[in-house]
A protein has these predicted regions:
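Proline-aspartate-enriched helix->loop->beta-strand connector
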Residues: 81, 85-86
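A short, active-site helix/loop in glycosyltransferases that binds the activated sugar's phosphate group
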Residues: 142-172, 177-183
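A short helix/loop element that forms part of the nucleotide-sugar donor recognition site in Leloir-type
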Residues: 43-47, 183-199
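Short His-centered aromatic/hydrophobic patch
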Residues: 91-97, 116
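Conserved donor-binding/catalytic core segment of Leloir-type glycosyltransferases
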Residues: 2, 200-205
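N-terminal strand-loop element at the rim of the active site
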Residues: 3-11, 15-69, 153-163, 169
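Active-site proximal beta-strand in glycosyltransferases
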Residues: 2, 88, 104-120, 137, ...
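Nucleotide-sugar donor phosphate/pyrophosphate-binding loop at the beta->alpha transition
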Residues: 68-75, 110-111, 121-143, 156-160
Length: 205
């Protein structure tokens, strides 16, 4: 099984891909692949280290569309797939979703799944570019084995508002987070924060 994400910067996709890699049954072997953070972005590789996950870094995969770097990234992903021979390729977010699924289709990977962590179908680009990205996602979704939405609202947007794919192809799986560290020393931490901001015990925050 191979997980492919845009890049290892702070955000939901890193946590999601890390947890899927770290906590999957020992019966399965998982390879995590992703691009590196861009200048000004916070690095999230410490999250992988915290859970004992090693990743294959893909410097060729950049945030913005670029014909030359995208072509290099696609070639590299294909090489990784051919060497690793995964039964499943699971991609996360737009850039990794496009390049990862294209590579998986070209390499005849049996199962190809994509998770939407957001989308760019409104408020990001002009009409022409938005139409193009929507068309690309529709074509990729047709060939994907399954699509994962992280909320019911997102599923509604993908299937009804923007018609990326049919409802039958989408499963809703909310992002999972490790909440244990927030449960530790809860009373002590609560008092510390309230003292810091001079809040009374009964004040609602």
């Amino acid at each position: 099984r191979e997980e492919i994400i845009n890049r290892f910067n702070i955000g939901g996709p890193t946590y999601n891909a890390t947890f899927l890699t770290a906590f999957l049954s020992d019966k399965f072997e998982t390879l995590l692949v992703g691009g590196i953070p861009e200048k000004g972005e916070a690095d999230s590789l410490h999250i992988l280290e915290e859970y004992g996950v090693k990743a294959t870094l893909l410097p060729e995969m950049k945030r913005k569309p670029n014909f030359f770097s995208d072509k290099k990234a696609l070639k590299k992903i294909k090489e990784i797939i051919k060497e690793y021979k995964p039964d499943i390729v699971h991609t996360h977010a737009s850039k990794a979703g496009a390049l990862g699924r294209k590579a998986a289709f070209d390499c005849s990977v049996p199962i190809v799944v994509h998770t939407f962590h957001g989308h760019v179908f409104h408020s990001y680009f002009g009409k022409a570019k938005t139409f193009l990205f929507r068309f690309i996602e529709q074509q990729l979704a047709k060939r994907s084995t399954g699509i994962i939405a992280i909320s019911e609202i997102q599923k509604q947007e993908l299937t009804e508002a923007y018609k990326i794919c049919s409802k039958s192809k989408v499963k809703v799986i909310p992002l999972g987070f490790d909440l244990e560290k927030f449960r530790q020393n809860k009373t002590e931490n609560r008092k510390k924060i309230r003292d810091q901001y001079k809040l009374n015990d009964e004040d609602v925050v």
